[in-house]
């Protein structure tokens, strides 16, 4: 019911919305406008009053800096909802922000989910969205949405491989003729990169750093493949021996060591999917290359590592972070196009049938 109050009052009929409900961030796509919301999946709540103090960017700034009665919550873990009530309240905020003060028609809403999601989890997402007032609900697997957003024509009889590395999951899939041929969902992704960096700093330097600091290291000097020109960065944390603040300089070589385990797991999973891919589609992938999407794909050298392990050209999609959200919204248009093609095909088939048989078919349909 949390979305019903919004959709029921502002939507009529006809618009299309795509929502990428990710572990690390939420993106909302509106047809004709593009991505209108792009914010972290974070909420800060006052535990004493159960009041939301901030959502998204503002809440993210509070991580690690709040007093005891205020908690910063990330309500999604490993691609699925871990705190349903907080997720509802977060979604309400983002949808209101996307819609603004201008009413739009009652929408068709597409929501992307990890390829490993259970039927129960999928049904919960669909029911919540439909109760919110959606005219129609489409549930899309993240690799399919990522492929569409990356500009791949998924309707062709040709194999395409997509590796979508989000915050909580890495989805790897081979897609052909509009569907997934073989896929896997790995619970190793961007959040695990951060955790690996935190663990490394604690073990090697006796330094405790927070999520924000780990993410900054990952973005600025993180690496999955040896750099030709090493880089470094100063970081501050708490010395676990003295308990006092301490500054140190961290190098990209250290980041290569810290991140070796999670990036190797992803590269091995890609190799494993290729081994399960039918020969004809594997040949297509060898010719066309592997496409990487999601924020995690931007880790320096990860594309090179996968290319080295698979011996297949690996490329990062343009605007990799937005691919899933763009594809989620555009899937609605894709589905409508497929329906039109199907209708035209049925019409051609009917036109080739004698008129007396056509009448019999129509009467049975009626």
PLM-predicted stretches and their roles:
Residues 1-165, 173-291, 297-366:
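Nucleotide/phosphate-binding catalytic cleft detector across ATP-hydrolyzing
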């Amino acid at each position: 019911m949390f979305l019903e109050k919004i959709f029921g009052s502002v939507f009529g009929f006809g618009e299309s919305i795509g929502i990428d409900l990710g572990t690390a961030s939420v993106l909302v796509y509106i047809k004709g406008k593009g991505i209108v919301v792009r914010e972290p999946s974070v909420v800060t709540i006052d535990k004493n009053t159960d009041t939301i103090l901030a959502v998204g960017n503002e809440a993210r700034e509070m991580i690690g800096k709040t007093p005891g009665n205020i908690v910063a919550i990330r309500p999604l873990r490993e691609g699925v909802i871990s705190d349903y009530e907080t997720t509802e309240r977060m979604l309400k905020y983002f949808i209101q922000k996307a819609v603004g003060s201008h009413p739009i028609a009652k929408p068709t809403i597409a929501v992307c989910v990890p390829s490993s999601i259970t039927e129960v989890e999928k049904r919960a997402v669909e029911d919540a969205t439909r109760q919110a007032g959606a005219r129609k609900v489409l549930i899309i697997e993240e690799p399919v949405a990522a492929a569409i957003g990356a500009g791949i024509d998924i309707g062709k009889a040709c194999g395409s491989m997509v590796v979508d590395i989000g915050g909580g999951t890495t989805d790897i899939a081979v897609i052909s003729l509009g569907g997934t041929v073989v896929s896997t969902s790995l619970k190793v992704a961007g959040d695990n990169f951060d955790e690996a960096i935190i663990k490394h700093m604690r073990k090697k330097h006796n330094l405790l750093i927070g999520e924000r600091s780990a993410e900054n290291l990952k973005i600025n000097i993180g690496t999955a493949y040896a750099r030709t020109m090493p880089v470094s960065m100063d970081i501050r944390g708490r010395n676990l021996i003295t308990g006092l603040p301490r500054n140190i300089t961290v190098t990209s070589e250290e980041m290569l060591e810290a991140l070796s385990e999670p990036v190797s797991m992803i590269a091995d999973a890609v190799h494993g999917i290729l081994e399960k891919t039918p020969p004809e589609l594997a040949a297509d992938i060898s010719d066309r290359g592997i496409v990487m999407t999601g924020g995690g794909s931007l880790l320096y050298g990860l594309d090179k590592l996968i290319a080295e392990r698979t011996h297949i050209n690996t490329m990062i999609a343009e605007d990799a972070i937005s691919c899933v959200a763009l594809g989620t919204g555009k899937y609605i248009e894709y589905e409508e196009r497929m329906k039109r093609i199907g209708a035209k095909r049925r019409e051609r088939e009917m036109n080739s049938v004698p008129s007396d048989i056509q009448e019999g078919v129509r009467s049975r349909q009626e």
